[in-house]
Every structure is written in structure tokens, then in C-alpha cells.
């Protein structure tokens, strides 16, 4: 795992954390690789909090273009956040009801 400053700097302190191995999505990596990625993200988030004192931190990981992935290499963003920073992540809530939630959960069972 390695980390570097995002060239786009959505907010000061925006860091990318990525796998060394050539993995395209989260589904392509091992449990150990996923755990290493999240451990590194946690360490970076702690450092970002100490260095930039953001009001919050968003950790974002996307898979495939329909999932907002723009670079075909497994990575995540550690993004310092401030009220009114203009960063938005919006999706419609559909409120499907408890029975539909049970049906959806059942599909995930082995």
C-alpha cells in the first residue's frame, strides 16, 4: 500500500491510498490487501486530522465507472471536510420498507 497527495486537492490534505498490486476494484483484492488498505487509510486520516484540523473526513472508495471509479486501479480517497466546502455526495433515498429490505438481505446470504 502507498499514499500520495491527490493532484486535484478537493480540500487541502486530500490523500490517495492505493494498493501496490495491480488490482482494479475492491472485489479483485484479497482480504489481507483490503485490510492493509483500510489500515493505511486510518493512519492517513489520523495524520490529516492532526495536520489540517478538518471538521470531518470522508473516506471514499469507488468501483467501476457506474460506481464513480475514474482510475482503473484500487484506491481510496481520504478527504478532509469542512462545512460549506462545496463537496457533495447525494443519492435519493427510496425507503423500500422492511419486507423489501428482508428480501434484499436474503440475496446476500451464502
What are these model-derived regions, one by one?
Residues 1-110:
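HIT superfamily nucleotide-processing domains
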Amino acid at each position: 500500500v502507498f499514499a500520495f497527495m491527490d493532484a486535484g486537492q478537493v480540500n487541502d490534505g486530500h490523500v490517495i491510498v492505493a494498493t501496490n498490486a495491480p488490482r482494479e476494484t475492491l472485489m479483485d483484492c484479497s482480504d489481507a490487501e483490503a485490510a492493509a488498505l483500510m489500515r493505511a487509510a486510518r493512519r492517513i486520516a489520523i495524520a490529516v486530522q492532526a495536520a489540517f484540523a478538518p471538521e470531518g473526513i470522508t473516506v471514499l472508495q469507488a468501483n467501476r465507472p457506474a460506481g464513480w471509479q475514474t482510475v482503473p486501479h484500487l484506491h481510496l480517497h481520504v478527504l478532509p471536510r469542512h462545512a460549506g466546502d462545496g463537496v457533495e455526495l447525494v443519492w435519493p433515498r427510496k425507503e423500500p420498507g422492511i419486507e423489501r429490505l428482508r428480501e434484499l438481505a436474503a440475496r446476500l446470504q451464502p
